[in-house]
């Protein structure tokens, strides 16, 4: 039904109307919350360790969460590290997880972390960045050093534009184009670069170094700290929805997806379960 009238008057009257709390009651979202809890229990977060022994980025963020805790403020850039930070860091306070959502703003984390530190100087602030994002705004490390913002940066370096690489792996048969950011030696040397910009910086390459490095960074509070975590290039973000498909087609892992509604009931019959097992066995052969 259209509302025709002077915008100022109409909006004022609508505001007055809805300000009367007895006019509108918020709908209960408990059924939806219960549904989400059920899905989280049935499809818990997880990741695979890399066969080649390289560091898993999910482990880095999981350890950061356990070490720095939920009282720290976490800010992310854009890409795989953004998704992993959302999944593997435990948040229980409002305004402690800052990112730009789906806006695609590579380079967001360092300036935003500086803003968070300026607003709440008593808080520990971690910028979680990828090697691609970091090269968009790493010069602001100098600003942080000069202006006295001792932020901490967890630099997840997989030597690639990881989210683009994942799409090329899954949907373009592994034909990689313009995603590799280095060769045998990663370029630039992020430790030397960060030190030149006024930060303390060090590199982590194995799982047994992660917690100690994070704790070391937490103890430095007179300047920015950049911790470079060199991780495997083939780690992927799950769950995922392919372009042009419905949210109902979400995949929990490659080739695996949960069922919803009537599909869910049908998929849980013994016949359907046996069919799934047989299909997986044939695929494995």
Predicted segments, located by residue:
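Alpha-helix initiation/capping motif
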Residues: 19, 25, 56, 69, ...
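A diffuse structural propensity rather than consistent per-protein peaks
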Residues: 25-28, 56, 189, 206
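Structural signal for hydrophobic packing residues in well-ordered secondary-structure cores
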Residues: 11-22, 36, 40-47, 65-68, ...
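Thiamine diphosphate
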Residues: 2-4, 8-12, 73, 84-285
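A short, charged, Gly/Pro-tolerant segment at domain boundaries
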Residues: 30-41, 232-234, 243
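Short coil/turn segments at secondary-structure boundaries
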Residues: 26-31, 77-78, 228
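Active-site diphosphate/adenylate-binding microenvironment
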Residues: 35-116
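Glycine-rich, acidic loop regions that bind phosphate or pyrophosphate groups
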Residues: 1-33
């Amino acid at each position: 039904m259209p509302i025709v009238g002077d915008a100022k008057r109409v909006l004022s009257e609508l505001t007055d109307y809805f300000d009367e709390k007895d006019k509108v009651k918020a709908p209960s979202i408990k059924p939806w919350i219960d549904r989400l809890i059920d899905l989280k229990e049935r499809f818990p977060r997880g990741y695979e360790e890399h066969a080649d022994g390289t560091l898993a980025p999910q482990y880095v963020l999981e350890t950061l969460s356990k070490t720095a805790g939920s009282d720290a403020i976490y800010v992310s850039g854009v890409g795989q590290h953004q998704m992993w930070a959302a999944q593997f860091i435990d948040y229980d306070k409002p305004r402690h997880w800052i990112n730009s959502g789906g806006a695609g703003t590579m380079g967001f984390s360092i300036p935003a972390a500086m803003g968070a530190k300026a607003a709440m100087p008593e808080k520990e602030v971690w910028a979680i960045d990828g090697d691609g994002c970091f090269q968009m705004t790493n010069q602001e490390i100098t600003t942080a050093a000069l202006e006295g913002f001792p932020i901490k940066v967890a630099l997840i370096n997989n030597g690639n534009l990881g989210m683009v690489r994942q799409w090329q792996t899954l949907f373009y048969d592994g034909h990689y184009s313009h995603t590799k950011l280095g060769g045998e030696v990663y370029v630039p040397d992020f430790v030397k670069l960060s030190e030149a910009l006024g930060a303390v910086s060090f590199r982590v390459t194995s799982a047994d170094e992660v917690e100690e490095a994070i704790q070391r960074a937490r103890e430095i509070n007179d300047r920015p700290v950049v911790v470079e975590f060199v991780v495997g290039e083939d780690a992927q973000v799950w769950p995922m929805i392919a372009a042009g498909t419905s949210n109902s087609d979400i995949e929990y892992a490659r080739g695996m997806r949960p069922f919803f509604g009537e599909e869910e009931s049908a998929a849980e019959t013994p016949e359907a379960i046996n069919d799934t097992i047989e299909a997986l066995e044939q695929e494995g052969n």
